[in-house]
């Protein structure tokens, strides 16, 4: 692993610290989640798939920085099920282990994601722009969790796109509401302080 940001460096350092504290009464297991997607009680429209879908619906345009940058994605239901699977697994399969949570077939380039969304929202224009400072690109293997814990993610980005579009079309979800963006909520709290 080669962390590219302070955030990822902190995560790796934390994982190493936790794993190094393993003993007979503490047997940690690290789960590394792919980028979450899908409907959830606390929706996030500041995550890649939902952000692209929101922009397609409201702006009729998806702007892509780094179109060939890869991202792994996982449905929130699969992430939850991976946690349950891990908790129920025998300690010899999880103690001191690190598992990536997702499905290898759910690695996409940003351009691939935009094109799939365009299938659902055909009026969407895709605009490729110069890269921002975020240069992260990574494809992830999820073979270890599949092999060791027999865990397989079941839901795809297409499932999420259909579910989210349905909820928005019914008027039950406003993708621009600040409650669906961590940065917007943080900004509101700072201003209130």
Regions found by a protein language model. Name each.
Residues 1, 25, 44-47, 93, ...:
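A generic fold-level signal
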Residues 1-30, 35-36, 41:
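Catalytic helix-loop patch of NAD(P)-dependent Rossmann-fold dehydrogenases
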Residues 8-11, 46, 107, 135-136:
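Short alpha-helix boundary/capping motifs
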Residues 12-19, 50-53, 81:
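Conserved active-site helix of classical SDR/Rossmann-fold NAD(P)-dependent CH-OH oxidoreductases
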Residues 21, 52, 56, 117-121:
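Short amphipathic helix/loop within the catalytic HATPase_c
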Residues 26-31, 38-63, 73-74:
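Oxidoreductase cofactor-interface core, primarily capturing Rossmann-like NAD(P)-dependent enzymes
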Residues 60, 64-193:
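C-terminal substrate-binding subdomain of Rossmann-fold SDR/epimerase-dehydratase oxidoreductases
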């Amino acid at each position: 692993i080669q962390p590219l940001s302070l955030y990822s460096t902190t995560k790796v350092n934390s994982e190493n610290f936790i794993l190094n504290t393993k003993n007979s009464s503490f047997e940690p297991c690290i789960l590394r989640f792919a980028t979450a997607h899908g409907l959830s009680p606390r929706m996030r429209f500041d995550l890649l798939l939902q952000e692209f879908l929101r922009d397609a619906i409201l702006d009729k345009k998806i702007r892509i920085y780094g179109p060939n940058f890869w991202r792994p994605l996982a449905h929130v239901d699969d992430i939850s099920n991976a946690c349950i699977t891990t908790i129920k697994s025998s300690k010899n399969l999880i103690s001191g282990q690190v598992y990536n949570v997702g499905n290898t077939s759910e690695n996409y380039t940003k351009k691939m994601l935009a094109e799939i969304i365009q299938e659902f929202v055909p009026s969407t224009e895709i605009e490729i722009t110069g890269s921002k400072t975020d240069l992260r690109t990574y494809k992830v293997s999820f073979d270890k969790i599949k092999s060791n814990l027999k865990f397989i993610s079941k839901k795809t980005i297409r499932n999420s796109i259909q579910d989210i579009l349905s909820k928005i079309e019914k008027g039950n979800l406003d993708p621009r509401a600040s409650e669906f963006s961590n940065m917007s909520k943080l900004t509101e709290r700072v201003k209130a302080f």
